[in-house]
From Swiss-Prot:
Keywords: Cytoplasm, Lyase, Phenylalanine catabolism, Phenylpropanoid metabolism. It catalyses: L-phenylalanine = (E)-cinnamate + NH4(+). This is a key enzyme of plant metabolism catalyzing the first reaction in the biosynthesis from L-phenylalanine of a wide variety of natural products based on the phenylpropane skeleton. The active site is at Y98 (proton donor/acceptor). It comes from Bromheadia finlaysoniana. Contains an active site 4-methylidene-imidazol-5-one (MIO), which is formed autocatalytically by cyclization and dehydration of residues Ala-Ser-Gly. This is Phenylalanine ammonia-lyase.
């Protein structure tokens, strides 16, 4: 809040309630925000000042394992020292202060003059977590590192009564990748994350039960942790208020939330791109992205999602081909696509708005002072309040998890259409691409897995914050459950990655199938045309035959017929191709009139020789076209290379995921693993942004 002084009075600025600042944070596009996050994530140094920390920086330190160096702004030292000195001076004066001379929480009526001993007892009784054997009950190192960074940042603002040297020690642990072991469970994030943060304090004070992880993953005690980190000053004897300053904050919940939201923002952009690629391989109608439709709805998330998809689809080679296909027999085809495609901007837009709002809420939280009491040196007083209540975390994470579940539901709906040959405009059932469909079930198992992922994701979407229990002798009778909600949202992010991986690999399989489809169709058309010219053009005496007019209509049959409906046995009489080719010749024969009675001009009599020659030639040509495709030398190039979605396809291929066929030993899951690991390592980020590098941030003009 801006404050100016005039005539000795403190006057509030123009935005005393901070609504204006909150609204200003949402200026600009979501994509630009994500680009900025990525840029911040990749910076080598995170400098903490107390007020400018970003979720991307938290993620960088959390995931970096010391690669992103943490520096503390020297400008913060004086303020931190002033509050620390104030506490000591108040103790010397005999001032009665909560957590300094009093007990804690519901037992704050107790009094003591042993301030240092009180802080030791605080850390000891809060060491109530359970680790068990193994690591399943230990907070992941990335989450702990995030919490450490956030706690330093909030304490740097100088309202907490803690020494600057303690904050430097935490930063050193981060930079040396020495990570205290914190319990996974046991906090209600009000009063802050007391139990887990007490284990950070335990390392700093050298408690014998404290453990830490080293860079190689081994577990060591506090003494070894300090030695490996190069902290030669020894363990800290906590001064009055310092233990409370360390544990009474929301850093664990907000730290995990920061990691979660960094990944969620990226996955939201991926969902937009996958929807556009889905439109391409499904031969959809891009009209659903027209700006006027979305302008009339007014919601910015929807407008941007549509504009992103519109940009990908503009000039797409697939969309040009789809337009020609839709122009054939338009009255026999659906006028519009199903909801999973047609309303994808309307579906994704609100989720992106929720994710953006949650991101800004958490960024406010990680830059807040959130312990109690707060030391106001300027007014010479300690303020007793409740900034440790992590409600912004619990609410933001519940909302984010709902948004993630909605994105996952859309992906599942789109994937279900993609693998279903009743809906996918000619792609084979299960996206199977082998020569024998009876021995190739492609993505059938993947669809079952997607149903499982989606179900679990929807179960996780249930809110955490409506399960509050009164705690600590009814002193903490309402509490945020912030870390619990953050942890559940982290689980949801992991599942959405599984779904995004499966869907992306499926879409790339569909891209390859469209490529194969074009080459097979080209081979069929050429073969039918050649056979028609040889058999149907001339009569027995060298004269032009009435059947020569069949060729054009025979080619139309091939254009209209789905290739994969007959590709495994193109001349089978039970498949539609041969049936419809014969029907063309029969129709011409019926229209041949009296000429049909003359054996020299009869079209009926050409059917047998036409079919026999076709049966001799077509299977060989189809197999040759398939072999050329598999050898990387197809007659027709893959049109994905002319599309803005190409970088995503290229990414999948470059990580080693290939074209799945029934003849290969490799399973779908093996291909998914390659892409999943790459996504988890952040390798999909640049290809995603490359898809949108030409976008100017605005929809196409309405004209």
């Amino acid at each position: 809040m801006e404050v100016s002084k005039e005539n000795g009075l403190c006057l509030q600025g123009r935005d005393p309630l901070n609504w204006g600042a909150a609204a200003a944070e949402l200026q600009g596009s979501h994509l630009d925000e994500v680009k900025k996050m990525v840029e911040e994530f990749r910076r080598p140094v995170v400098k903490l000042e107390g007020v400018k920390l970003k979720i991307s920086q938290v993620a960088a330190v959390a995931f970096g394992g010391g690669a992103s160096a943490v520096e503390l702004a020297e400008s913060a030292r004086a303020g931190v020292k002033a509050s620390s000195d104030w506490v000591l001076e108040s103790v010397d004066k005999g001032t009665d202060s909560y957590g300094v001379t009093t007990g804690f929480g519901a037992t704050s009526h107790r009094r003591t003059k042993q301030g240092g001993a009180l802080q030791k007892e605080l850390i000891k009784f809060l060491n109530a977590g359970i680790f068990g054997s193994g690591n399943s009950n230990t907070l992941p190192s990335a989450a702990t590192r995030a919490a450490m960074l956030v706690r330093i940042n909030t304490l740097l603002q100088g309202y907490s009564g803690i020494r600057f040297e303690i904050l430097k020690a935490i930063a050193t642990l981060l930079n040396k990748n020495i990570t205290p072991c914190l319990p996974l469970r046991g906090t209600i994030t009000a009063s802050g994350d007391l139990v887990p943060l007490s284990y950070l304090a335990g390392i700093l004070t050298g408690r014998p039960n404290s453990k830490a992880r080293t860079p190689n993953g081994s577990t060591v005690d506090a003494t070894t942790a300090f030695r490996l980190a190069g902290i030669s000053s020894g363990f800290f004897d906590l001064q009055p208020k310092e233990g409370l300053a360390l544990v009474n904050g929301t850093a664990v919940g907000s730290g995990v939330a920061s990691i979660v939201l960094f990944e969620t923002n990226i996955l939201a952009v991926m969902a937009e791109l996958l929807s556009a690629l889905f439109c391409e391989v499904m031969q959809g109608k891009p009209e659903f992205t027209d700006h006027l439709t979305h302008k009339l709805k007014h919601h910015p998330g929807q407008i941007e999602a549509a504009a992103v998809m519109e940009h990908i689809l503009e000039g797409s080679s697939y969309m040009k081909m789809a337009k020609k296909l839709h122009e054939m027999d338009p009255l026999q085809k659906p006028k519009q696509d199903r909801y999973a495609l047609r309303t994808s901007p309307q579906w994704l837009g609100p989720q992106i708005e929720v994710i953006r709002a949650a991101t800004k809420s958490i960024e406010r939280e990680i830059n807040s002072v959130n312990d109690n009491p707060l030391i106001d040196v300027s007014r010479n007083k300690a303020l007793h309040g409740g900034n440790f209540q992590g409600t912004p975390i619990g609410v933001s994470m519940d909302n984010t998890r709902l948004a993630i579940a909605a994105i996952g539901k859309l992906m599942f709906a789109q994937f279900s259409e993609l693998v279903n040959d009743f809906y996918n405009n000619g792609l084979p059932s299960n996206l199977s691409s082998g020569r024998n469909p009876s021995l190739d079930y492609g993505f059938k198992g993947a669809e079952i897995a997607m149903a499982s992922y989606c179900s679990e994701l929807q179960a996780l979407a249930n809110p955490v914050t409506n399960h509050v229990q009164s705690a600590e002798q009814h002193n903490q009778d309402v509490n945020s459950l912030g870390l619990i909600s953050s942890r559940k949202t982290a689980e949801a992010v992991d599942i959405l990655k599984l779904m995004s991986t499966t869907f992306l690999v499926g879409l790339c399989q569909a891209v390859d199938l469209r490529h194969l489809e074009e080459n097979l169709k080209n081979a069929v058309k050429n073969t039918v045309s050649q056979v028609a010219k040889r058999v149907l053009t001339m009569g027995v005496n060298g004269e032009l035959h009435p059947s020569r007019f069949c060729e054009k209509d025979l080619i139309k049959v091939i254009d209209r017929e789905y290739v994969f409906a007959y590709a495994d046995d193109p001349c089978s009489s039970t498949y539609p191709l041969m049936q419809k080719l014969r029907a063309v010749i029969v129709e011409h024969a019926l229209n041949n009139g009296v000429k049909e009675k003359d054996s020299n001009t009869s079209i009926f009599q050409k059917i047998s020789s036409f079919e026999n020659e076709l049966k001799a030639a077509l299977p060989k040509e189809v197999e040759a076209a398939r072999a050329e495709f598999e050898n990387g030398s197809p007659a027709i190039e893959n049109r994905i290379k002319d599309c803005r979605s190409y970088p995503l396809y290229k990414f999948v291929k470059e990580v080693g995921s290939g074209f799945l066929t029934g003849e290969k030993v490799v399973s779908p899951g093996e291909e998914f693993d390659k892409v999943f690991n790459a996504i988890c390592e952040g390798k999909a980020i640049d290809p995603m942004l490359d898809c949108l590098k030409e976008w100017n941030g605005a929809p196409l003009p309405i004209c």
